[in-house]
Structure formats: C-alpha cells, structure tokens
C-alpha cells in the first residue's frame, strides 16, 4: 500500500473536498516501499548585496548580470556588488522587460524604450515619436518589436532608434488588446487578452512579419508579465472568451491546461486587476522543471518533470511567512556565476538560492 505524501485533501465551507499542496516543501519523485516520492525543504534565500531600489527585472548577457533596480539600470557581480549605469525612469514599482540584440541591451520601462551600449558605455532612450508607448517588446531577426496594446511596431534594421510608421503591423484576428510579446523558435507570439497570434518574418518593404493563421491559440493572457517561455512553449495565466482564468502551456495552435481545480479555485480568489500583475518565471534545475506563478500572497510552482514521472499534476506553494501566507520574497531569477540569483520584491536586497538552509533573507519560514 502506497502512502500519499505529495499532497493531501481537506474539507472546506463548500460541498467539495479541497486539495492541500505542500508549503515551502518541494515534491521529489522517488519510488520507495511506502510512497512514490518525498518532500524536501524548499530553497533558502541568502542576501549578498543591496541596490538603489526594488528590483524590477534581470537578465544575463555577455557574462554580465543586468538588473533594473528602482529607476536605475545596474550590473551585479558574483559577490553582489552593484554598479549603476544610468536611469530608465519609473514607475519604480512596475516590472520591466529586458532583451538584447548582438550589440544592444533593450529595456522597456514605464512605456519607454531604452538601449544600453556596452561598447560605448551609453544609455539612451528611443525618442522617435512614431514609436509610441512601449507596453512590451522583444528582439527578433535584427528588429526590436514593440507593442502599445494596439499596434505591432518594429524599429529600423539599420537604426534601432528610428521607426517608420508605414511599417506598423497589428494582431487583428480578434479585437482584443495586445498584452505581451514573446519570441519562441524565432517566431513572435503576440499574446492578446483572448487570443494568441504567431508571426513569422517574411520580409518586404512594409511590416516584415506575417501572421501564421494555423498557429493561432484561442486563449489569451491576463497581464503583460503573466507569461513566459517554458519547456519550448509559452506558459500563461488566462483563458478564452467567457472563460475563467487558468494556467496553460501552448504553442502551434494547441494548449495544455496544467492548473488543477484547486489551482483554479485559488486564482478565483483574486480580482482581475490583481491577476493582471501576476508574474510567471521558469527555472530548470536538477531534473526539475519549475514554473513559478507569483501571486500577491505567495507563489504557486508547477514541476513538469515531476508531473511526468508521477502521472499527476505536481504543484507546491512558496511563501515568506511564519504563519499563513504572504508574498514569496524571491523574484527575477537569473542563472549566473553557478547559482540562481534572486531579488527581494519588498526591499532593495539581492541574493541567491541555497539548499543548506530554508531561511528567507535570514528569517525562519513556515512549512
């Protein structure tokens, strides 16, 4: 007889039994005489530095870790030392998008687009009036593609600071606003609120990208950062028209729902405006394939590798609290210097994940 220890059930004030997922404990598939897995303590968070503000996003490029902390673009070395490069403005509480070309690092902050050039050590804003508001962006085939929620805009191939208004494109299969842009296998995914459209570079004198009609996904995303690349697909929180929010992975016109009924119930506890601020991140480490869903009072984590090994959806919860649930205080994961670098969403602290302690920033947390 096998003992189920990777999750449990409990009674609530509804007629249904609810699923109880591990809190700050990570399910690990491992067959034994009594169970098909075990729980190990969640990763600890160790601080090693501070920056000029709360971290808003990070990226590793050409051997250097870049972060936007407060309104400042900074670099972080292996010891946690922070060097300020320039100012990209606020709001300091909003996440940024970072992506790079061969020679420029792009930063979308507060509706603006900036470029850091490490060769000249200069930070400059794209001030072309035809660029418009930059809600999100990605780099693809030599272009920086941005969206203001309505149009798809590309910079000139020979000048990333120039925009030609006759080269605007749009995501028009459904009259829903564009929420985010992601690149997957050199195709651009325009994630709208009810649909996801895929574009490929076909060249031409006007907008150089063309919609791949057969690749459209009939579901959308709830917010700009509620999506990420995961397992060579796109993971997102959202749904189609007249659908409650859930968590999916999708690509090439197909989706797979990975959220369970319990996870869906937890999502329904948040308002639409709260869900619009959800952040998704992925992290592959030691035979685990994690998808983090950062919510206001904790983070839900899906493990695709464990789910495949156990034949059921494996979820667990992370929280930086001794009692109850509170915001999980590790965000914006960056693999660099042989460790996972993280930041604290509630302070200017930066650090890294460890497995020899379960403390978060020196404080004890619950199980």
Regions found by a protein language model. Name each.
Residues 77-80, 117-121, 158-160, 201-204, ...:
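Short loop/turn segments that connect beta-strands within beta-propeller blades
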Residues 173-184, 275-278, 283-284:
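Phosphate-interacting basic helix/loop segments used at nucleotide- and nucleic-acid interfaces
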Residues 189-214:
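Surface-exposed extracellular loop regions of Gram-negative outer-membrane beta-barrel proteins
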Residues 1-104, 218-234, 239-367:
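Beta-sheet repeat architectures centered on beta-propellers
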Residues 118-142, 165-168:
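Asp-box/WD-like beta-propeller blade repeats and closely related beta-sheet repeat scaffolds
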Residues 58, 105-107, 111, 136-153, ...:
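Carboxylate-rich, polar loop motifs that coordinate divalent cations or form catalytic acidic clusters
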Residues 152-175, 205-212:
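Short, flexible helix-coil linker/hinge segments at the edges of structured domains or between repeats
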């Amino acid at each position: 007889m096998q003992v189920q220890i990777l999750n449990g059930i409990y009674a609530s004030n509804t007629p249904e039994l609810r699923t109880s997922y591990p809190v700050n404990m990570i399910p690990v598939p491992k067959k034994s005489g009594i169970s098909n897995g075990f729980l190990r303590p969640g990763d600890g968070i160790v601080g090693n530095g501070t920056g000029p503000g709360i971290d808003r996003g990070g990226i590793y490029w050409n051997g250097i870790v870049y972060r936007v902390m407060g309104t400042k673009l900074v670099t972080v070395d292996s010891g946690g030392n922070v060097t300020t490069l320039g100012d990209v403005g606020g709001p300091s509480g909003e996440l940024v998008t970072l992506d790079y070309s061969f020679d420029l690092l792009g930063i979308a902050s507060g509706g603006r687009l900036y470029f850091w050039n490490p060769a000249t050590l200069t930070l400059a804003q794209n001030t072309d009036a035809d660029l418009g508001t930059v809600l999100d962006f990605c780099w693809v085939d030599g272009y920086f593609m941005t969206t203001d929620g309505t149009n798809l805009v590309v910079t000139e191939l020979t000048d990333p600071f120039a925009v030609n208004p006759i080269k605007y494109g749009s995501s028009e299969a459904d009259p829903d606003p564009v929420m985010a842009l992601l690149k997957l296998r050199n195709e651009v995914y325009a994630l709208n609120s009810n649909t996801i459209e895929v574009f490929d570079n076909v060249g031409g004198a006007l907008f150089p990208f063309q919609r791949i009609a057969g690749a459209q996904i009939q579901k959308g995303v709830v917010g700009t950062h509620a999506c990420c690349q995961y397992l060579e697909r796109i993971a997102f929180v959202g749904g189609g028209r007249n659908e409650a929010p859930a968590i999916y992975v999708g690509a090439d016109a197909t989706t797979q729902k990975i959220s369970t009924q319990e996870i869906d119930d937890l999502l329904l506890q948040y308002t639409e405006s709260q869900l619009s601020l959800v952040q998704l991140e992925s992290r592959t480490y030691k035979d685990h394939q994690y998808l983090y869903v950062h919510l206001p009072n904790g983070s839900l984590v899906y493990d695709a590798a464990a789910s495949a090994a156990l034949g059921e959806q494996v979820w667990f919860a992370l929280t930086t609290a001794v009692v109850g649930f509170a915001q999980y205080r590790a965000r914006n994961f960056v693999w660099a210097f042989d460790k996972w670098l993280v930041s604290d969403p509630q302070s200017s602290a930066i650090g890294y994940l460890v497995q020899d302690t379960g403390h978060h920033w020196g404080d004890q947390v619950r199980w």
